[in-house]
A protein has these predicted regions:
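Active-site loop-to-helix "anion-binding N-cap" substructures in soluble metabolic enzymes
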Residues: 1-137
Length: 137
C-alpha cells in the first residue's frame, strides 16, 4: 500500500519543566508499541513532537531534540534490539521552519522532520532540500 504509519510522542510544557521528558517518552513508546512484533515496528516512523511546540512557533533546541530522539532509539533498542532500533526513522516535529531545520537535522538521531503548517508554505521546498542534504535518499 505504500503507507508508513507515524507514531507521535512528546511531552507537555509542564512535563518538560518538571524534568519528566525522558520518562514520559519511555512510557509513551512502551505503551504505544505494546503488542507489536519487531517486523511491524521496523515499518513505522516515530516522531518526537513536543506538545508545547505544536503550532506555537516554539521549537525544541537542537540538543533537546537530540536528547529526546536518542532516548526513543534507546527505548526501541531495549524493547526490540539494536537492529530494529536502527531501522526505525525517528523524526522531529514541532514548528519546523527553514531557519531551524538544518540545526535539527545535523543531530545524529534526528532522521527527518514531521512538517505541519510549513508544508503549506512556498519555503517547503527548502525544507526538502535541507533534509536531502543530511539524509540523501
Amino acid at each position: 500500500s505504500g503507507l508508513k504509519p507515524i507514531f507521535c510522542v512528546g511531552e507537555t510544557l509542564s512535563q518538560r519543566e518538571s524534568g519528566e521528558t525522558l520518562s514520559v517518552l519511555d512510557n509513551q513508546v512502551t505503551e504505544g508499541l505494546k503488542g507489536l512484533p519487531a517486523p511491524d515496528v521496523e515499518k513505522i516512523a516515530i516522531a518526537y513532537e513536543p506538545v508545547w511546540a505544536i503550532g506555537t512557533g516554539k521549537v525544541a533546541l537542537p540538543w533537546q531534540a537530540q536528547e529526546a530522539c536518542s532516548r526513543i532509539r534507546e527505548k526501541l533498542s531495549d524493547l526490540y534490539g539494536a537492529e530494529v532500533a536502527s531501522k526505525v526513522s525517528i523524526l522531529y516535529g514541532g514548528s519546523i521552519k527553514p531557519e531551524n531545520f538544518a540545526s535539527l537535522m545535523a543531530r545524529p538521531d534526528v532522521d527527518g522532520g514531521l512538517v505541519g503548517g510549513a508544508s503549506l508554505q512556498e519555503s517547503f521546498a527548502d525544507l526538502v532540500k535541507t533534509a536531502l542534504t543530511f539524509r540523501p535518499i
